[in-house]
Amino acid sequence: MVSAKLPSIFIEAQLPLIYANIILAFALGPQAHTFRVCLTLPILLFLVCQSLYREQNGPWEDLLSNNSLVMFTVFVYIDWILLQSPDREQWHKLNNAKTESNGPTKAKESGPPHGFFQRIWFGCRIATAWRYIGWSCQVKNVPMEHSAGYPRRYFIARKSLRALAFYLMKETLEVYTASTPHGGWWDTQNTKPALSIKNVPLWHQFKYTWVHIFLAYATLEMANSILGVVSVILHLATPQECPSAFGDLEDFFTVRKAWSTVWHQHMRRLTSTMGLFVARDLMQLRKGSFQSKYVQLFVGFGVSAGLHAGVALLCSKALNDDSALFFFGIQAPIIMLEDHVIAKGKSLGFKDSPLWRFIGFVWTTLAIGFTCRAWVGSMIDNGMWVHARKKDSVIQGLLINAIQQP
């Protein structure tokens, strides 16, 4: 039987090879669009399929992280190459990264270059611009924390402390989750957990769902802080171009705001691009109309559902979405219902107040927690809480001893 499996060295270099393929396609330019798609799309699909041959030699969370990035690159290819967004929208670097949280302002350049090697360099630049901060394609609602000219040494000190704080939070939650019947340590239990989370009472599932959300929050924010510090030290970015990954928790009082401003915006560019393409280019809906607004909403969450379902497929090597399609797919109807309830309340004379925000906080916590329960439960049952023990970590050792004490 013919196998599509490549030698292990290519599987290990899967992500760099995928990005090299995308940058090559971008460098060929829109004038050779048909040729570059025919050349690079089969290569992309072939490289993505290598995830099906990747052996699990470590915790399941490592496999999930790698496949999440693989699926992310698929949608980057759609955005850059199939939709030709960089050339169609004339992406450019902004002058001194003068941006606001609601979008970019003043331009420094006038779109991608035309030469092959110049486009390779341009592709490398935008590929390493996380969330495209400081570029004309920057996503909305990114929490801009620093003004232009913010001192680098202050930024490095502040972000280093922030990374340390989230590292401690991450280590604490990892030790706690490993101590539950639904987790463990990879060096002693390199299998799935002993007890399925789906066999515990509903409220326990709800609690563990939020524990997992906070663990993801701490892990991503720690990584984002470290990346910001390294980027600023190496002069690859300015402090203004390295904001926090998450928004202000004070905005966590509607499901819409939870997704649009509080949670990380790493997928915002891809989801909004697909939504705009369907609403304006395919369906020719009027900008700002009711239909356009909700088509973009449903398509955006559809893209997110497809990405996370694809990750589950690559991890399980089977047609299994781990309830990702349900969780992400149901968020759009919830937000649509929420919008109409809020609009009705305003028409009846209700105004924003601390009481309504508290009620909104409770509603949002329950709505996300219960709809996310099946998806998070599937990941935990797959071994998401079976962590790698850091034998040289004094902090982790102290936390383990503290939890094991009667």
From Swiss-Prot:
A GO term for molecular function: acyltransferase activity
Enzyme kind, highest EC tier: transferase
Pathway given in the UniProt record: Mycotoxin biosynthesis
Subcellular location: Membrane
Keyword field contains rRNA processing: no
The entry's keywords: Acyltransferase, Membrane, Transferase, Transmembrane, Transmembrane helix, Virulence
Main location: membrane
Signal peptide: none
CC terms in the record's Gene Ontology section: membrane
Matching Pfam families: MBOAT_2 (PF13813)
Taxonomy, superkingdom: Eukaryota
Transmembrane regions: 9-29, 32-52, 63-83, 295-315, 323-343, 358-378
Enzyme Commission identifier(s): 2.3.1.-
Topology relative to the membrane: Multi-pass membrane protein
Induction: Expression is co-regulated with the other genes from the sirodesmin cluster and corresponds with sirodesmin production.
Role description: Acetyltransferase; part of the gene cluster that mediates the biosynthesis of sirodesmin PL, an epipolythiodioxopiperazine (ETP) characterized by a disulfide bridged cyclic dipeptide and that acts as a phytotoxin which is involved in the blackleg didease of canola. SirD catalyzes the O-prenylation of L-tyrosine (L-Tyr) in the presence of dimethylallyl diphosphate (DMAPP) to yield 4-O-dimethylallyl-L-Tyr, and therefore represents probably the first pathway-specific enzyme in the biosynthesis of sirodesmin PL.
Entry similarity comment: Belongs to the wax synthase family.
UniProt name for this protein: Acetyltransferase sirH
Organism, as annotated: Leptosphaeria maculans
Underlying gene: sirH
